[in-house]
Each structure stands twice: as C-alpha cells, then as structure tokens.
Amino acid sequence: MIPIEPPKDLYTPIWEEFIEVAHESDEIVVPIGPHHAGSGHLRVTFRVKGDRIVDAIPEPGFVHRSMEKLAENKLYIQNIPLFERLAINDPANMNLAYVRAIENALGVEVPERAQYLRTILAELSRIEAFYYDAGIFSLFFGHTTGFMYCMAIREMIIEALMQISGSRSGPSFIVPGGLRRDISDDVLGLIDNMTFALHKRMKKFESIFVNNPVTIARAKGVGVLTKEDAIRCGMVGPFLRASGVNYDVRKV
C-alpha cells in the first residue's frame, strides 16, 4: 500500500519566530486544527501561558461552505433549508435573515400576526443556541452539572419548536411572506407556560455555574474584549453587549 502524502499547502507552517518568542518567554505553543473534535473546523496557533492566550495566528477559510454558489441554481424556496445550515443550532434566525432579504427585494408585506410569531420562533431558537454554547462552555470547565442543566433547558425549547414545526432541527418554518402555517393557540399556551419553568432553571444555572467562585476565578480577566476592539472586529449579540456596547439588532 502506497502512503498518501498530504498536500503541503494544506495549512501554513508555524512561524519560527513565533516559536522562538514562546520559548524565550516560558510559554507554550498550541496548534489547533484544521481538524479537531468539535463541530467546526478551524486553524489557529496559540501562544499560551497558563489559562491566558498571549498571542494567536488564525488561518481562516476552513469553514467556507460555498453557500452562495450552491444557492445560484436553486429556487428561492429551496434555499431556505440550505441557509439554515449556516448555524444549525440557530436555524430560525439564519432563515429569517435570508427570507427578509427576499421580502425587501420584492416589496412583500408580512402580516402582523406572522411578524409576532416569527419573533417568538426566533427568540426560542436564539435561547436554545445560547444554552447549547453555555453548556459546552460549562463542559470545558469540567462542570458537568452545569452542562446537564443547559441541555435540560435546551431540550425544553426544542420540544416547543417541534410542537410548532414538527422538526427538532432545521424546521424551514419561516418562508417569504410569513410562515409555512399558523401556530395554534394551544402551542402558544404551552410556550407561555414553559417560559416560567425556563426562568427558574436559568436562575438555578446562574447560581451553580455563572456565580460559582471557581468559574469566576478561572474566567475573570481572561480573554477580555474591549469596547473599541469589539466594534473594530464587528462583534454582535451577547459578545458585543458584554463588552459594554449597548446595541441590539433586534431593536433596530
């Protein structure tokens, strides 16, 4: 069997100067990617000292999925499940951005009820994605209890989304002009009741993980992103607001 040599230009070699500086400063060079155990492929080379990242060299391009090219030969409606895969943990908001672009281009007016229902769907999807991220963050800390709390919260929301669309992921429920179908009052009542249970579980998660002294000791002052850098890097969502920028695209 003849061994297959990997392409030499698969990724850029680590700079010798980068390694030398790390050794002189008693730091460790940690190359990550382009393949790793997570769901997204990336290539970053870090210089770390303890839990602190001193420097990093990112190499972008490993998660490019050619969405624009794939969409060229499809109908508008066929692209809905395609663009949901940009962030499969938050498909409703990926879909909403695409559908609104179509509506704005064609001058389509969306009924008021559909706008409200879209907002409910998008918020549920956003919270579900947030607690997935928070759960993985807890797991990285070795806090399995926090991880299980997040997954329990996420499962409640996924069950509600399944009641709406019939799908646990990739619902393709938001379409140009409104929704694929109406949401019944029974399901809306279920969501209303669920919010109270969610609030209690969220408060519990805050007490066992967010306000945990170990979490604070390990996370405080690590990876600080200033307001100026957040704006310069084009950050959005909770990352932007956590840096002190009072901006929420949902209110624009």
What function would you assign to each model-found segment?
Residues 1-252:
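Active-site bordering "gate/hinge" segments
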